[in-house]
């Protein structure tokens, strides 16, 4: 019996839930096998982590027993101690899932010279769980030990290293230089640097004074066309005896700023809430979006974290959907704020991830559903 497919959102997805990324999947897998360095720019909730870690990474690892995937989530790191914690989490998880306890104790332990290795049983899964205890007390020195362990592993295994939300190390003094030394010492290792805060990534990789200037090959994830979304939607709506018109889907995709996670969240809402045997029109989508937004009580609490001026800028960006020049006279007249104040707010909103910048379109609210909510807030 075939399992009914739903729309997955706010979770990491596998290939069965991926919509039209086959070309990118093949290209990135080829880059991984060749030991390339890739800097992947993509807005938040575009599925870059799922694509690189869950799909390309697993494809890479299945290619050979000597292939080994290491994933490090660097989102919101603000100190050397937090970087150390993420390195510990990534390395121990990879070791626990890839190697047997016997293999770790017989061989892998030799690559972990800066640590005391302990293997416990995970109480939730019953699976072996590796724990590394640092022999030094200073976070920076421990980071060097993690880097050294990874370099030693790279001599025995073909590694694919994923550094997710890498741009946040920019908030930690000295971290960029630390990573530059580490990355340059890895010879044939595939490195995938993922990031969504383009303004930070631009400084890190395009500023001639930055430690990582011109590192890696720049890559992007582009919007998925309605042409490819349509069969994806119809397949998941069909078991609920629903069908969506192309014009309605075009409207939905546009209002969700082409963000796959938001598109799928609305898709699942439609699947669960629209009466059976309904042909979903633009009018139905508009009504269902309003109903969905009314359930989003968390948005009101989220906005309490912003000043009135910051909320004004957010609301005006959501009104225009995309703003190319927030320093333009037209936008400044709309928000009724000085240019310097507006520029400061834009920078802050970018830093905290409240807004995104897309090269061809401009600034937009990061969460499309929040943007929709702001229209009536």
What residue ranges belong to the model's regions?
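Conserved Walker B catalytic segment
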Residues: 37, 131-198, 206
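C-terminal leucine-rich, beta-strand-based interaction scaffolds used for sensing/assembly
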Residues: 2-7, 299-300, 304-377
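Conserved AAA+ ATPase "SRH/arginine-finger" region at the nucleotide-binding site
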Residues: 217-228
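A short, basic N-terminal segment
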Residues: 1-43, 58-62, 114, 155-157, ...
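Amphipathic alpha-helical "lid/sensor" segments that cap RecA-like P-loop NTPase cores
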Residues: 234-298, 308
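Alpha-helical DNA-recognition elements
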Residues: 58, 269, 348-352
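Short regulatory helix/loop adjacent to the ATP-binding pocket of P-loop NTPases
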Residues: 198-216
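P-loop NTPase nucleotide-binding core
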Residues: 41-46, 50-159, 189
């Amino acid at each position: 019996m075939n399992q009914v497919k739903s729309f997955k959102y706010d979770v990491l997805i596998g290939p069965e839930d991926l919509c039209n990324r086959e070309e990118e999947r093949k290209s990135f897998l080829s880059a991984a096998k060749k030991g390339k360095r890739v800097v992947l720019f993509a807005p938040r909730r575009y599925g870059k982590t799922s694509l690189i870690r869950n799909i390309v990474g697993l494809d890479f690892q299945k290619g050979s027993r000597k292939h080994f995937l290491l994933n490090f989530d660097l989102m919101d790191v603000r100190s050397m101690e937090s970087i150390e914690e993420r390195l510990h989490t990534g390395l121990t998880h990879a070791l626990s899932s890839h190697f047997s306890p016997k293999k770790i104790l017989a061989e892998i332990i030799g690559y972990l010279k800066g640590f005391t290795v302990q293997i416990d049983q995970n109480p939730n899964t019953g699976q072996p769980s590796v724990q590394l205890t640092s022999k030094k007390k200073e976070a920076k020195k421990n980071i060097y030990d993690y880097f050294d362990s990874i370099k030693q592993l790279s001599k025995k295994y073909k590694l694919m290293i994923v550094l997710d939300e890498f741009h946040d190390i920019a908030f930690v003094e000295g971290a960029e230089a630390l990573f530059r030394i580490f990355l340059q010492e890895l010879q044939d290792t595939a490195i995938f640097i993922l990031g969504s805060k383009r303004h930070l990534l631009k400084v890190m990789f395009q500023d001639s004074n930055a430690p990582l200037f011109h590192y890696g090959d720049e890559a992007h994830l582009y919007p998925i066309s309605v042409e490819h979304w349509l069969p994806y939607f119809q397949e998941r709506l069909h078991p609920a005896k629903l069908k969506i018109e192309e014009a309605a889907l075009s409207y939905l995709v546009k209002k969700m700023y082409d963000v796959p996670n938001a598109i799928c969240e609305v898709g699942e809402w439609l699947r669960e809430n629209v009466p059976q045997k309904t042909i979903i029109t633009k009018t139905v989508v508009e009504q269902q979006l309003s109903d969905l937004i009314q359930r989003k009580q968390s948005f009101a609490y989220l906005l309490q974290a912003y000043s009135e001026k910051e909320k004004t800028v957010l609301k005006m960006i959501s009104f225009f959907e995309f703003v190319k020049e927030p320093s333009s006279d037209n936008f400044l007249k709309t928000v009724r704020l000085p240019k310097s104040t507006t520029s400061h707010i834009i920078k802050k909103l970018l830093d905290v991830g409240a807004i995104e910048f897309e090269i061809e379109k401009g600034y937009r609210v990061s969460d499309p559903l929040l943007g929709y909510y702001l229209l009536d807030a």
